[in-house]
Amino acid sequence: MSRSGQPPDLKKYMDKKLQIKLNANRMVTGTLRGFDQFMNLVVDNTVEVNGNDKTDIGMVVIRGNSIVTVEALEPVGRSS
């Protein structure tokens, strides 16, 4: 959540493939399906990436406080 108390503006990332870096040197890729004001994410078709190993873990909820960065892996339009 931003410092101003506003919820994150992730609408433009909905249904887009993302790479999400998490604490403890973890990383996942998947399609964003939902989020809330605490930046908890619902990610579908999720793959956990650990070096050269990739593990399909399906649909997951990622707590916002464990997210370090979010990067789009496909073009993202502007939110309205």
From Swiss-Prot:
Which is one GO molecular function term here?
Answer: mRNA binding
Q: Where is the signal peptide?
A: none
Compartments annotated for it: namely:
Nucleus
**A Pfam family annotated for this UniProt entry:** LSM
**InterPro entries under this entry?**
Lsm7/SmG-like, LSM_dom_sf, Sm, Sm_dom_euk/arc, Sm_G
UniProt keyword annotations, A-Z: mRNA processing, mRNA splicing, Nucleus, Ribonucleoprotein, RNA-binding, Spliceosome
Span of domain Sm: 5-76
Q: Name one GO biological process term.
A: mRNA splicing, via spliceosome
Which branch of life, at top level?
A: Eukaryota
Q: Please give an example of a GO cellular component term from this record.
A: spliceosomal complex
Record's function text: Probable common Sm protein, is found in U1 and U2 snRNPs and may be part of the spliceosome.
- Return the similarity comment: Belongs to the snRNP Sm proteins family.
Q: What is this protein called?
A: Probable small nuclear ribonucleoprotein G
Q: Report the source organism.
A: Arabidopsis thaliana
